[in-house]
Design a protein with these regions (language model features):
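Compact, charge-rich alpha-helical regulatory domains located at protein termini
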Residues: 218-249
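Extracellular adhesion/carbohydrate-binding repeat motifs centered on closely spaced tryptophans
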Residues: 1-215, 224-226
Length: 249
């Protein structure tokens, strides 16, 4: 198809004779399908009309044409109140994608995920802006720890001091049996005592504390072997923070 203006001259470039936009090549032929014009990609339907503010499928992938008709590429878009990301080729992203140093997850329909998400069997927390979180995060009043890959840690010691249970929440102000040992955690989640009811303490917490006297005994102290601990500590500083004093011998 060709277009001739009122003077009978053949039209080229952009024209809008009926409220729709068309693009005519240098030889005047009407463009259909995909075309690159002035550095941007556009899509023209079978009638030659430029499509805009809509998704177009091509080769099994989806592309978004903005209000100007130009294909979105390498940018965030929100055509319907949800967030999507068009990669540098213009294709709608699904699955995990690293953008400007942060990781995001996009559902199969391209919508950016946020908040709690279970993905491939693991739990992740994607903040209000959708970015994957790592490390400690306080969510809904509880503390959670997310590994470097973003997966929430469960039933695991963190930094040798804190413990997250099977729900992922850090234990606070409670006593819990873990691997046969009774641990007491303070209001900040730090474990302050550990005991199994016997005469021994674990190798990583060898200091014995006597609850009635508030005295702690280090390995090598005279009464260490005959002391039955009510509490075990990893360091003297930890014992003293719990109100215990060092034995004199």
């Amino acid at each position: 198809w060709f277009h001739f203006n009122d003077n009978g001259a053949m039209s080229t470039g952009w024209i809008s004779p009926n409220g729709h936009w068309y693009y005519l090549s240098d030889n005047g032929a009407m463009t259909t399908g995909w075309a690159r014009v002035d550095g941007s990609w556009y899509y023209f339907d079978t009638t030659g009309a430029m499509r805009s503010s809509t998704w177009v499928s091509n080769g099994g992938q989806w592309f978004y044409l903005e209000g100007s008709g130009a294909m979105a590429a390498g940018k965030w878009i929100s055509p319907d109140g949800h967030w999507y990301y068009a990669d540098r080729t213009g294709a709608m992203v699904t699955g995990w994608k690293q953008i400007d140093g942060a990781w995001y997850f996009f559902h199969g329909n391209g919508v950016m995920a946020s908040g709690w998400q279970q993905i491939s069997g693991a739990w992740y927390y994607l903040g209000g802006n959708g970015a994957m979180t790592t490390g400690w995060q306080q969510i809904g009043g509880a503390w959670y720890y997310f590994n470097s890959d973003g997966a929430m840690a469960t039933k695991k010691w963190i930094e040798g001091t804190f413990y997250v249970d099977d729900s992922g929440a850090m234990l606070v102000s409670t006593t819990r049996t873990i691997d046969g040992w009774n641990y007491t955690f303070d209001g900040n989640g730090r474990w302050i005592t550990v005991n199994n009811g016997g005469y021994s303490c674990p190798a990583w917490a060898p200091i014995k504390g006597n609850a009635s006297s508030k005295i702690y005994h280090r390995p090598g102290n005279q009464s260490y072997d005959i002391t039955k601990p009510e509490a075990c500590f990893s360091t003297g500083t930890q014992a003293e923070a719990a109100g215990y004093h060092a034995a004199k011998r």
